Structures are given as structure tokens and as C-alpha cells.
């Protein structure tokens, strides 16, 4: 495969080409994907020998290069650093459909790296990387049961679109990524604008048709350049040891698993495991470490099989619930007195405390990535401390799981956030998981809804989330509502659905089997809707509408619209004017290019004061208007009167009174307040005022009347005489 080979097809109206044999030739498999002007290189490498441990060590990396969009990285070092949240989420997106397609017992390390070389904003580098990951694996000698493919799906005016452009995505009411094999779907990630379950299912199936075509395209590549798969020794338990451990523990394990409370159940199961392990330690076997590791693995498989049998055959769950039953719910708002809004949501032994913070728009998050988004004013962050599951350990920076759960909650709530015009605030939600026994990401969505309502955020509708599960034995399957940790760990599906009473706003599906049929997806969505509506009813019984007033500790934001050409007057030279306003009032001021001014402060009186100052600065005088101002300067020809801050005008001496005035000081003194009328604004913007226009004219005898002198306003500069 030393010679470069190119395979091409059409993808959503753009040319898709896969190049192999030229780049990254020392990797187990590599492919350069060109999609429009987007270029992504994906390389896959598999270790020759299994790694120690009882898990499959798969690592997926998605590396964004700023040069791909013609940017230099920000910061002091001017080079790419830790992955962005988007890169982390994309790596998870690629990992999820690939992981289920490695054989059970496969322990060799596999690393997949996608490097973004060039980005065409209308040709998704994420989808190119997912395709490249599949191609790199299927043409390598790594035993992978693919190919897979992924596509983005949108819906515009009821019509479904594959890989929508930026312009199309803005008009779409569905933002869906779906991945799978030729035969089935195995990963879904979606955000939506309250769409129905039927519409979402149609979008998923529409995407799967395109996935089939891309899988067929990859089969052509495999036939041409695919390597023979290497022989891998899969981890398999010793049959005699397995039978021996099963005979000693199965009966006790069945009893332990039926313990309803999580901690008590864990203790009962652990007791069974410890008893069996101790019995093998007592035998003082020659290869004790390996035997004990294998026994521990067998015991976990017995635990898994019994839980699955209990659900599949008896239709009873470990905690005694029915398959569609939701755990007991409780919620509370306003727990934290000094924050802007808070909500505590508890579902069984899963609990999330969400806090809403409101801030001026200037505190939005700046996005410095490969996309077109420059900033975002709504954020949801998810924290999962180890005490939430009764464990100890070091606290680290948010990992992939926390970033992913935070993003899912953000997507679920994004649609109901009021527009910037209706609610000019930056909104940050933080969900602290205090207790976890499954579905903590969905608890964070429910808690965040409560927190925003408590903060007075005028959301369009409350949002609730629920996690669905699946146990599939052969053709028999059981769908579970509101899964707990054990059902997530040993089950076949984690299907999270969030939305309002009117429709879905977010969806995420991961499975551990090859794929799901349309029938299972349909039933899962229908059952999820029933659960979601039940939870929404509970949430609205706690708080049904946003608080009418914001917290006393939240900034109060007032908006003012000024003419764009007046922005420079408000800012002043070198920011002198705006800084003076901020210093005098203590407010925060943001000015948009269209002339929208946002003024924020906890003190409404200071907000109003700042508004008054700015209104004075941008105010424009109108001919015929009457003002009361102060005399700021006196000249021989008249007095200059400040009408309002930053604007003054001239009262010519002839406009002071109806009678002749010898000296300006005979009528006005410096600092006097005087009421005047605007009689002219000349072409240079100079304002001429009159005092006498507001005075009653005294009648004079006909013989005493004198011809009026010609009015002279601002003195004109004499032109230099020509020599």
C-alpha cells in the first residue's frame, strides 16, 4: 500500500475523496479525507499485545489546528494547547459508534488520531474525521467489525437535509448527528426546537440511509487496499473455573442484587464477592494473582447476567421498580440566599444542585476555535465530585465526561433561553452533582430549569430530561425508564431524552451492542415522552413560572438606543467620557455597534443616573424647543448657555431682551439659570438661542419705535485681505 490511491464519491452535493497509501504509512491504517475544502488526516494504531486490565483501552483524539482556518492561536505561547471543549466533544462523538464494534474480550490498545488540516465551514470536519476513523480501522490489520459512518441531519420547512451548510443550519429546527453500520444505528446526538418524537425518528432514519451508502463506499476501499486482520487472542474465562465460581456464588448473588437501596445492595454484592475471593486466597495457588483477577471478572459477569435475567425475564429491576417506573421525585428552589437563582432536584438517589448566575453581556464566553461562532452568552457547566458516589480521590480539571454532560444540558436548554433583545444577560448555569445513582446529567437539566425560574429568567418553557435503558437478550428486549447506575453499567443502551411538554430539545444515545432497529428507537422515544411529562408535572408544581423580579443581588440591566454616530461622544477621547460615567455611578456599560447601550448595576438608582447622563450627551436640540440652562461663559456679543451636558448655545446680546441691552452683564451673570428658546441650528451644528422670545413684548408709542438692528450671532472670522 505504498502507492497513493484515491477513492471518490459525492456527499451532500460536495466531492468526498479518500486518499490512502501516501501519508502516515507507519500507522496500522491511515486515510486522508477531503470533503469540499475540508481536509482531515486520521491514523489508527493497535498494539501487538494485550494491555493489563479488564477493559478495552481505546483512545480517540481529535486535534484542531488553528492554521486550518487561517488563525494564529491566542495566548502567550501562540501554539495549540489543551483540546477545546469542541475538540473533546468531537473525540467522544467518534469514540461512541466505534467502541461497540470491537469484540468482547479485546484488550489490545487502540489509538485513533484525527488531525484537522483545512476547514471549509460548510463541510463538517467532525463528520470527515468520523469517516476517516472508520476507514483507517477497516483498511488496517486491527480486528474491527465496521465500517461505520456518521452524518449530520437538519430539517428546513419540513424537509430533511444531509450535512446542512452554515446558512441551512441556522434555519433548521433539528441539529442531529447520527452514526451506525449498514444494518443499524448505534449513536445519536441531537439538539432540536421542540420537535415531535415522530419527526426526530424520521430524521434518524433519513440519516441512516446516507450511512448505508457511505458504508458501501468503504467496502470498495476495503476490497482494494484492506489488510488481512491479525489474529488476536481475546480474553476468555477458563470454563472450569467459571462453572466452579458460578456454582458457589450464583444463588447468593441473586439475593444480593434484589436489595433495593443502592449502598445496601453494593455492600451485599461486595460481601458475596469477598467471600468467594477469600476462599481462593486460602488455597494458596501458584498463580494466585492471575486466578484472583479472573475470579473477580467472573463474579462481575455473574452479577451482570443476573441483573439482565431479572429485568428481561421477571420484568423486575434491582430496586423493585417496574420497567417504566420513575424513582421518587423531590425539588426545591431558592436554597442559596445570595445567588441569583438555585434549584435542587432529587430523583431517587441522584441529586443535583443547579445555580443560575446573571451577568452583563460583556461577560460572555469568547470562542476561539475552528467554527464561525465568536461568543456565547449561555453556558451550562456540570461538576461530578467523587463524594457523590461515596468515593475518595484527587479532584482534577473537568474531564471528557463532565464536559460532555455539561454540553448535553446546554443543548437541552438552549432553545428555551430568551433572546438577547428580550433578556440582555449572560446566563451561566452550574450543576453540582451531590449524589449519583444514574441519570445525573438529566437531573442537572431539571435542576437548571428550576434555577432559571428561581432567577427570573423568562424561559419559553420548562425542560426536563430522562435517561432510558435497554436489556436485549436475543430478539427479546426490555426498555427501562429512568435507569440507575447498575442498569447503565450492565445494560445495552443509555438513551437520554430532554424536552418540554411540546417536544424534544436534546437527545443522546449510546449503545454497547451492534445497533438498534427502528422499532426499538420508536418505543424508547414514546416511553421517554411519558416519563418526561411526568417529571415536568413535578417541576411545575414546585415553581410554575419565572419570578417576576430578579434577585436583589443580580445586576439590573437597562437598555438605551442611541444613534451610531453618537457612540464616539459617549465614549469620549481615549474613553475619558465613558470612564467618567462608570466612576461616577459604579455601573457597567456595554455599547454595541448598532447603538444599543446596556447599563448594568445592582443599584437601580445608579442605572437611572447613568441613563440620564448618556441621554444628555446624545441629546440633540430641536428648533422651537425651550430649555433651562446655566450661563457658562460671557462675551461682549452674548452669553453661552449650557442646555444639557455637552451641549451649549449662544444667546446673542440682541436676543436677551426686547429693549436695547448695553452690556450682557446687565441681564445675565456667570452661573445664572436662564430659560431660553432654540431659534436656529446652523449648518455647522451651532445653536442660537433667544431669551426675549419667551418674554412679553412691551408696547411702545408709535413715535418711539426704532428700526431693529440686524441680528448677529456667532461672530464670523474676517477673511485675510489679499495683498
Swiss-Prot record:
It is found in: Cytoplasm. Transmembrane segments: none annotated. It comes from Listeria welshimeri serovar 6b (strain ATCC 35897 / DSM 20650 / CCUG 15529 / CIP 8149 / NCTC 11857 / SLCC 5334 / V8). Keywords: Cytoplasm, Magnesium, Metal-binding, Nucleotidyltransferase, RNA-binding, Transferase. Residues 555-614 form the KH domain. This is Polyribonucleotide nucleotidyltransferase. Its EC number is 2.7.7.8. One of its GO terms (cellular component) is cytosol. Residues 692-723 are annotated as: Disordered. InterPro entries: ExoRNase_PH_dom1 (IPR001247), ExoRNase_PH_dom2 (IPR015847), ExoRNase_PH_dom2_sf (IPR036345), KH_dom (IPR004087), KH_dom_type_1 (IPR004088), KH_dom_type_1_sf (IPR036612), NA-bd_OB-fold (IPR012340), PNPase (IPR012162). GO terms for biological process: mRNA catabolic process; RNA processing. Residues 693-723 have a biased composition (Basic and acidic residues).
Amino acid at each position: 500500500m505504498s502507492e497513493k490511491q484515491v477513492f471518490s464519491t459525492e456527499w451532500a452535493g460536495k466531492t468526498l475523496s479518500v486518499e490512502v497509501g501516501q501519508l502516515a504509512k507507519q500507522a496500522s491504517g491511515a486515510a486522508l479525507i477531503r470533503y469540499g475544502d475540508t481536509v482531515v488526516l486520521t491514523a489508527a494504531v493497535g498494539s501487538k499485545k494485550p494491555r493489563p486490565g479488564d477493559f478495552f483501552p481505546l483512545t480517540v483524539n481529535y486535534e484542531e489546528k488553528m492554521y486550518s482556518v487561517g488563525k494564529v492561536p491566542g495566548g502567550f505561547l501562540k501554539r495549540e494547547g489543551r483540546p477545546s471543549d469542541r475538540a473533546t466533544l468531537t473525540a467522544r462523538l467518534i469514540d461512541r459508534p466505534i467502541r461497540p464494534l470491537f469484540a468482547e474480550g479485546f484488550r489490545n490498545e487502540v489509538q485513533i488520531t484525527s488531525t484537522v488540516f483545512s476547514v471549509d465551514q460548510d463541510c463538517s470536519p467532525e463528520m470527515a474525521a468520523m469517516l476517516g476513523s472508520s476507514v483507517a480501522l477497516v483498511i488496517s490489520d486491527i480486528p474491527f467489525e465496521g465500517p461505520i459512518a456518521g452524518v449530520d441531519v437538519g430539517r428546513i420547512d419540513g424537509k430533511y437535509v444531509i450535512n446542512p451548510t452554515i446558512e441551512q443550519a441556522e434555519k433548521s429546527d433539528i441539529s442531529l448527528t447520527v452514526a451506525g453500520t449498514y444494518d443499524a444505528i448505534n449513536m445519536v446526538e441531537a439538539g432540536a426546537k421542540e420537535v415531535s418524537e415522530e419527526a426526530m425518528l424520521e430524521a434518524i432514519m433519513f440519516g441512516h440511509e446516507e450511512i448505508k451508502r457511505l458504508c458501501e463506499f468503504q467496502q470498495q476501499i476495503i476490497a482494494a487496499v484492506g489488510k488481512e486482520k491479525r489474529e488476536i487472542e481475546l480474553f476468555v474465562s477458563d470454563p472450569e473455573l467459571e462453572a466452579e465460581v458460578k456454582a458457589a456464588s450464583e444463588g447468593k448473588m441473586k439475593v444480593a442484587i434484589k436489595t433495593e437501596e443502592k449502598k445496601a445492595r453494593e455492600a451485599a454484592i461486595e460481601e458475596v464477592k469477598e467471600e468467594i475471593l477469600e476462599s481462593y486466597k486460602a488455597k494458596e495457588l501458584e498463580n494466585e494473582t492471575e486466578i484472583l483477577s479472573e475470579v473477580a471478572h467472573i463474579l462481575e459477569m455473574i452479577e451482570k447476567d443476573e441483573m439482565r435475567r431479572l429485568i428481561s425475564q421477571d420484568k423486575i429491576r434491582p430496586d423493585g421498580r417496574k420497567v417504566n417506573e420513575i424513582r421518587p421525585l423531590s425539588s426545591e428552589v431558592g436554597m442559596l440566599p445570595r445567588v441569583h437563582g438555585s434549584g435542587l432536584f432529587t430523583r431517587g438517589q441522584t441529586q443535583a444542585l443547579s445555580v443560575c448566575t446573571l451577568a452583563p453581556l460583556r461577560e460572555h464566553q469568547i470562542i476561539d476555535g475552528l467554527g464561525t461562532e465568536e461568543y456565547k452568552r449561555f453556558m451550562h457547566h456540570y461538576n461530578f465530585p467523587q463524594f457523590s458516589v461515596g468515593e475518595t480521590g484527587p479532584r482534577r480539571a473537568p474531564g471528557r465526561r463532565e464536559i460532555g454532560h455539561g454540553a448535553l444540558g446546554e443543548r437541552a436548554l438552549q432553545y428555551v433561553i430568551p433572546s438577547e433583545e428580550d433578556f440582555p444577560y449572560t446566563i451561566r448555569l452550574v450543576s453540582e452533582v451531590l449524589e449519583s445513582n444514574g441519570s445525573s446529567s438529566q437531573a442537572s437539566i431539571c435542576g437548571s430549569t428550576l434555577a432559571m425560574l428561581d432567577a427570573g429568567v423568562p424561559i419559553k418553557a420548562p425542560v426536563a430530561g430522562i435517561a432510558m435503558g435497554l436489556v436485549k437478550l436475543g430478539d427479546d428486549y426490555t426498555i427501562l425508564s429512568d435507569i440507575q447506575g447498575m442498569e447503565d453499567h450492565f445494560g445495552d443502551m443509555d438513551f437520554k431524552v430532554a424536552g418540554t411538554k411540546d417536544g424534544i430539545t436534546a437527545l443522546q444515545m449510546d449503545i454497547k451492542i451492534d445497533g438498534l432497529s427502528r422499532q426499538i428507537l420508536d418505543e424508547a422515544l414514546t416511553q421517554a415522552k411519558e416519563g418526561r411529562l411526568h417529571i415536568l408535572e413535578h417541576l411545575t408544581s414546585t415553581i410554575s413560572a419565572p419570578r417576576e423580579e430578579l434577585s436583589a443581588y443580580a445586576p439590573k440591566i437597562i437598555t438605551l438606543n442611541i444613534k451610531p454616530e453618537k457612540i464616539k461622544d459617549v465614549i469620549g477621547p481615549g474613553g475619558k467620557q465613558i470612564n467618567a460615567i462608570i466612576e461616577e455611578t459604579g455601573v457597567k456599560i456595554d455599547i454595541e455597534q448598532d447603538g444599543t447601550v446596556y447599563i448594568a448595576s445592582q443599584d437601580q438608582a445608579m442605572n437611572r443616573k447613568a441613563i440620564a447622563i448618556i441621554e444628555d450627551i446624545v441629546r440633540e436640540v430641536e428648533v422651537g424647543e425651550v430649555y433651562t440652562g446655566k450661563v457658562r461663559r460671557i462675551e461682549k456679543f452674548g452669553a453661552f448657555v449650557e442646555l444639557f451636558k455637552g451641549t451649549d448655545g449662544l444667546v446673542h446680546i440682541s436676543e436677551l431682551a426686547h429693549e436695547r441691552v448695553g452690556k450682557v452683564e446687565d441681564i445675565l451673570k456667570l452661573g445664572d439659570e436662564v430659560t431660553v428658546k432654540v431659534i436656529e441650528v446652523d449648518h455647522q451644528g451651532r445653536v442660537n438661542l433667544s431669551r426675549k422670545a419667551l418674554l412679553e413684548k412691551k408696547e411702545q408709542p408709535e413715535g418711539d419705535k426704532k428700526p431693529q438692528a440686524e441680528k448677529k450671532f456667532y461672530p464670523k472670522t474676517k477673511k485675510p485681505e489679499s495683498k
